[in-house]
A protein has these predicted regions:
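A late C-terminal transmembrane helix in Major Facilitator Superfamily
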Residues: 334-370
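Extracytoplasmic
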Residues: 9-43, 230-235
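Helix-loop-helix hairpin linking two adjacent transmembrane segments in secondary transporters
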Residues: 140-186
């Protein structure tokens, strides 16, 4: 008989929403090439870049308000509203018959998924110990990786067996089913830590006057450009560079996001070990980011790999280490600002990611159409180390008033459940 902390059971259920989050989002990456071959309506890589840009603008604009909203109304209401809204967006995408209609629904998806990211961060902050938070973020990456890994086969299955519309309908149905599952779980396993009373918008937005938050935001724009590349363009890389069809590419690209989870898990484990050795959480996250950023430089060689198998391994290696970088970088705001403002502070990073992706999506499409992936991989390979250097210079290793009292709260709470080996 083994004892598993109940807080980890709750986090596992909550983070299962991340699977649906990226399933809804990443179906589009494969569908972009399916639409180009099925000719139901005219669709180009430029249109795909425009969809990514519109999604990202909505994602960025909504992010700061979504973080404040989740901090204000609480975890359960915030998560339920976000998931319900993205299910509606998925249904609308499935019912679309033109690029113009797709733009409307992908914008709504961007708004809703910004709230979902804030909710995941809130759950990690409320349920887990400070030393466990990077591992909690790594579990979130598992959900994102599974969703992104399943998405190519999911899109191909419905598009070639039934209709591409049903890929989005099915994703929406699964999302709606998650809401009662989480509400029931949270009833039986409440968070061990309750933050102070919700702050108003002026108090939350006052964080924008802190230079440390701006350093984290700019670093996120730099480091996560490579994440955006592989999350959105991996199928296109194999189709354009190695001349595969969309179904053939789907046999390879599912591997890339799953290795991202392994990278996030290792990144979380590195900082966990460093914290246990006596380093402050901030210092540990920064050290883990440095290790990952140095290894990501190998991305520059990915376009030189001669066949789809090696190219997939190269993309996977790159994504592995950028996710190790990401999981630690996204945990830094929780370490610095605490659980009570975790939704807003991490949403500031989500805002930065959205601004970055909306800015680069259309230029990326143009460069890919004209020059291929080589110049992009060469440029993006050095961006995570630039992001690390910015944080290293502007964010101190020891933050006054860092929140460590949560560990005492959790340890004094009856927070374990027993799972027998026969269950």
């Amino acid at each position: 008989m083994r004892t598993i902390p109940a807080r980890w059971v709750a986090i596992t259920v909550f983070i299962s929403a991340s699977i649906l989050n990226y399933l809804d989002r990443q179906i589009l990456a494969t569908m972009a090439d399916i639409w180009r071959t099925q000719h139901e309506f005219a669709f180009t890589y430029g249109d795909y870049g425009l969809l990514l840009a519109v999604f990202s603008i909505a994602y960025a604009v909504a992010a700061l308000f979504a973080g404040w909203f989740v901090d204000r109304v609480g975890l359960n209401r915030g998560a339920a509203w976000a998931v319900a809204l993205w299910a509606v967006a998925s249904f609308g995408t499935g019912a679309s018959h033109s690029v113009g209609e797709l733009l409307v629904w992908r914008a709504l998806l961007g708004v809703s998924e910004a709230g979902a990211i804030a909710a995941v961060t809130k759950a990690v902050a409320l349920y887990l110990l400070p030393r466990e938070r990077a591992m909690g973020q790594a579990m979130s990456q598992l959900g994102l990786s599974l969703g992104a890994g399943v998405a190519p086969a999911f899109a191909v299955f419905f598009s070639y067996r039934f209709s591409w519309h049903w890929a989005f309908y099915a994703a929406g149905i699964l999302s709606l089913a998650w809401i009662p599952l989480w509400l029931a779980t949270s009833r039986f396993i409440p968070p061990a830590s309750q933050p102070p009373a919700a702050e108003g918008a002026p108090q939350s937005f006052s964080l924008l006057a802190d230079p440390k938050l701006w350093a984290l935001m700019i670093a996120n724009m730099l480091g996560m450009a490579l994440y955006s590349l592989w999350a959105n363009w991996a199928p296109t890389f194999l189709i354009r560079v190695h001349h595969l069809t969309p179904p053939e590419a789907s046999h390879y690209t599912w591997i890339v996001p799953l290795t991202g989870y392994l990278g996030a898990l290792l990144g979380g484990a590195i900082s966990w070990r460093l914290v246990r050795s006596g380093q402050t959480p901030v210092a540990a996250r920064k050290r883990a980011c440095l290790i990952a950023a140095l290894l990501v430089i190998a991305t520059a060689a990915v376009p030189l790999l001669p066949n789809p198998t090696l190219a997939t391994l190269g993309m996977s290696f790159s994504f592995f280490w950028v996710c190790a970088w990401s999981v630690n970088h996204y945990t830094l705001p929780i370490d610095i600002y605490g659980a009570s403002r975790s939704g807003f502070s991490v949403s500031a990073l989500v805002f930065a990611y959205g601004v970055m992706q909306s800015s680069i999506s259309r230029p990326l499409a143009a460069v890919i159409e004209r020059y291929g992936f080589a110049p992009i991989c060469f440029l993006f390979a050095g961006l995570p180390i630039a992001g690390y250097l910015l944080v290293h210079l502007l964010v101190p290793n020891r933050i006054e008033g860092q929140e460590f009292s949560q560990s005492q709260l959790v340890e004094s709470t009856p927070s374990t459940c027993r799972l027998s080996s026969t269950s």
